[in-house]
Amino acid sequence: MRKNKYLYITLLAVLGFHQEAMAQAIASTPRLVVNITVDQLRTDYLETFMPLYGNDGFKKLLKQGKVFASASYDFTPVDRASAIATIATGTTPYYHGIVGTEWLDRQTLRPVRCTGQNNTPINILTSTLGDEMKLASSGTAQIYAFAPTADAAILSAGHAADGAAWTNLNRWNNIDYYAPVPLWQSDYTKTYAVETDINKSITELALSCIEKSNIGMDETPDLLNVIYKQGATPEESYKNIDQHLSRLILRIERRLGHNNVLFVLTGTGYSEEREEREDEEKFHIPTGKFNIQRTANLLNMYLGAIYGSAKYVEASYKNQLFLNHQLFDQKNINLADVLNRAQEFLLQVEGVRNVYTSNQLLTSESERLEKIRNGFCTEKCGDLIIEIAPGWKLVNEETHESTTQRVNFISFPIIFYGANITAERVLTPVTVDRIAPTIAKAIRIRAPNACASEPLF
């Protein structure tokens, strides 16, 4: 009898401890995740303009947050759309499918936007963090995204959000893909025009969301995505973003409490600074112009000399060449042989540093090719990827575009702040695909379905 009594007391103690631990776990789970992305954020500028900041924006995050000082994207090339999709999905374009803001449609041979003509998230091939939050909460989690552009808003929001909005000249655009636009959002975007200071308008809309939607007010974690843009000059941009960042953080903390909110801030890992006219020849710097259309024509002539006159190269786009698969099938020509011949030919063209074939990227296990493979998607990329020499200009005569090849590393941080996070500066290099699993761990849900990366902490 006494033995049973002791067993009963022990069970009560264990159950009590378990319930207390569960209560503490629920209490420590952030009610709101504020995922802030600063387009083209750079560590050098962030530090250079430190004297211009107030105490509650960048300075607060850098001093009181967990700062991963050396972040990068584990694929190339990186642009706004591919970067934001990677933040949302925790994986690379190889899996999530967003290889860029635009890509060439293989059927029409015309460029298409990553969100399509109707501005929807259907081109994201995997789940996003917001999608997993919806699944984990049986749909009760609230997910919003506000940005300067459609692609940034929609890719952040994911497949199952409650709302997303972006700026278009001096007015707001709402997405009605998910469901009817929430009434508070519809009223706001109809009432308030977008100001010249777009970041201010985005901040105002985000704060209106906090107040009108009751986001973050219950125990189910919600997600608010905010994307800021760069302005005319770096100095103006960083000072401007700091002011709005400060206001956003203070208002949200005042409403929800510091420990109930997890703020995450990072950048998009690339830079689109206007190229100044440089006198390379004067200083004997190796340079030149690589014309992608002329190269496509030369390759077509070369293949014609081997296989007979025909249109073997269907199109060129950026640094990619697209071959006519149907024609090779009709002629019963082995595509792998064609790719190898084309690669050998292109490597002899002046200004070409390297050439990668689709077969090579899909089958090779070389670590050297890993970043290029991670940025590749069979349905949306060319058969031949051309890497031109550093300093050379990639010229497109049809679009009159010209970009200079640079391989400079763009340093930017990942910062976590709030939600009982201890301040720390981590110098170990990390990749952005680890943000999503880190947030998922913090709010105790699964990471997105193509995310194989470990949480940062």
Language-model features and meaning:
Residues M1-S28:
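Bacterial Sec-dependent N-terminal signal peptides
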Residues T29-V34, Q64-A69, Y95, S138-I143, ...:
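Loop/turn elements at helix/coil->beta-strand transitions in domains of secreted/extracellular proteins
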Residues R31-R42, L61, I87, M133, ...:
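Beta-strand elements within well-structured catalytic alpha/beta cores of enzymes
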Residues R42-T48, Y73-D74, G116-P121, T191-T196, ...:
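Second-shell loop/turn segments in exported
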Residues L46-Y94, Q142-A145:
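Short, structured active-site-proximal loop/turn typified by the sulfatase FGly-forming signature C/S-X-P-X-R
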Residues Y53, S70, D79, T101-N118, ...:
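Secreted, luminal/periplasmic, and some membrane-associated catalytic domains
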Residues T92, G97-T220, K229-G231, E344-N354:
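His/Asp/Glu-rich, glycine-adjacent segments
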Residues I292-I333, E401-I443:
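Substrate-binding rim/cap in mid-to-C-terminal beta-strand-loop elements of soluble/periplasmic
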